[in-house]
Amino acid sequence: MSTIQQLVRKRRKKIKKKKKLAALDSCPQKKCICLKVHTITPKKPNSALRKVTRVKIISISKMFTTAYIPGIGHNLQEHSMVLIRGGRVKDLPGVKYKVIRGCLDAAGVKNRKNGRSKYGVKRPK
């Protein structure tokens, strides 16, 4: 506990709240350019090769982040334009964003019947 004299000399510091999704900058989505498309392995109990992409956010020139590519198969490559949204992947440390499928250069998932809206698939006729 500080004394009154100590508080007169130096005020208490305000604790700044850290943003969970700094790259989105209070926006629902951001447009990005793919720099590298690769796979990474998940944390301990799980085992797989998860598809991720290293992206550069267009509006924030020096901001780079990693985004997860959901669904089976993708057509993304270097210099593809993608739209990212928030939403972390629990077993991939440091991955806090997801690519929106069916938008810009990211094609929708083929032969998808359920949960189509998250994978950019139109309603079957």
UniProtKB/Swiss-Prot annotation:
Entry keyword set: Plastid, Ribonucleoprotein, Ribosomal protein, RNA-binding, rRNA-binding
Gene Ontology biological process terms in this record: translation
Cellular-component GO terms for this entry: plastid; small ribosomal subunit
InterPro entries: NA-bd_OB-fold, Ribosomal_uS12, Ribosomal_uS12_bac
GO terms of molecular function: rRNA binding; structural constituent of ribosome
Matches recorded under Gene3D superfamilies: Nucleic acid-binding proteins
Task of the protein: With S4 and S5 plays an important role in translational accuracy. Located at the interface of the 30S and 50S subunits.
Annotated family: Belongs to the universal ribosomal protein uS12 family.
Name this protein carries in UniProt: Small ribosomal subunit protein uS12c
Organism of derivation: Euglena longa
Gene from which this protein is expressed: rps12
